[in-house]
């Protein structure tokens, strides 16, 4: 039986880097780790809540967090940064996000710095493609059509290969199954292959569907 492993952890230190950069004493490690997860969740929820229209989606590729003694630095890599600009009020949207994160952390003695980095080719990032697929599935667009369209979007961004897998009660069928599609080559067993990956669950009227995307960036 095949032994499954996370493609990002499999390549950590070779083609993938850590998303959090900090050191902590043993007694504080679990607390800081939970804080990182809360920060990422808060940012994702904020972007979903403050998008301009129902046809848009967050477009967050990844969130990197680094810590110093009294400073938390957060860098958000996003495909569509204008979604954070609320009603033309400039960067007040980012300031509101900063205040929301600080209130969630319930800390007054630490500083928080948030930077936005635009992703040049957003559809080369599996997280952004997964959000797009999830939005289409929520609208009951056929899953095969959605996968074909997602592969086309990725190939326009000149990726070497992409593989998409969707599992669950597809098209409302009573028996859950797994369907997948691929464009180009995706060498999952090659450690030096620069493969990006994400898993994204989506709630539909038929239940939860799991979306997995592998993208070869070379």
Swiss-Prot record:
Assigned keywords, A-Z: Chloroplast, Plastid, Ribonucleoprotein, Ribosomal protein, RNA-binding, rRNA-binding
Zinc is among the record's keywords: no
Cellular component, GO annotation: chloroplast; cytosolic small ribosomal subunit
UniProt superkingdom: Eukaryota
Biological process terms in GO annotation: translation
Pfam family, one: Ribosomal_S3_C
Subcellular localization: Plastid, Chloroplast
CDD domains reported in the protein's UniProt record: KH-II_30S_S3 (cd02412)
Record-annotated KH type-2 domain positions: 47-120
Annotated PANTHER family: 30S/40S RIBOSOMAL PROTEIN S3, SMALL RIBOSOMAL SUBUNIT PROTEIN US3C
Subunit composition and interactions: Part of the 30S ribosomal subunit.
Family: Belongs to the universal ribosomal protein uS3 family.
Protein name according to UniProt: Small ribosomal subunit protein uS3c
Source organism of the structure: Picea abies
């Amino acid at each position: 039986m095949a032994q499954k492993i996370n493609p990002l952890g499999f390549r950590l230190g070779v083609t993938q880097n850590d998303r959090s950069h900090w050191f902590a004493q043993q007694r504080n490690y679990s607390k800081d780790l939970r804080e990182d997860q809360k920060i990422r969740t808060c940012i994702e929820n904020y972007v979903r809540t403050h998008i301009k229209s129902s046809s848009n989606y967050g477009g967050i590729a990844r969130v990197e967090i680094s810590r110093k003694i009294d400073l938390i630095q957060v860098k958000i890599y996003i495909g569509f940064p204008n979604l954070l600009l609320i009603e033309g009020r400039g960067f007040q949207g980012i300031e509101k996000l900063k205040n929301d994160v600080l209130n969630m952390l319930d800390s007054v003695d630490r500083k928080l710095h948030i930077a936005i980095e635009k992703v040049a080719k957003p559809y080369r990032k599996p997280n952004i493609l997964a959000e797009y697929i999830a939005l289409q599935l929520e609208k009951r667009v056929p899953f095969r059509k959605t996968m074909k369209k997602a592969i086309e979007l990725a190939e326009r961004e000149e990726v070497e290969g992409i593989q998409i897998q969707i599992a669950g009660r597809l098209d409302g069928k009573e028996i859950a199954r797994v369907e997948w599609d691929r464009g180009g080559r995706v060498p999952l067993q090659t450690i030096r292959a620069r493969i990006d990956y994400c898993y994204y669950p989506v709630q539909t009227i038929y239940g939860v569907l799991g979306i997995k995307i592998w993208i070869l960036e070379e």
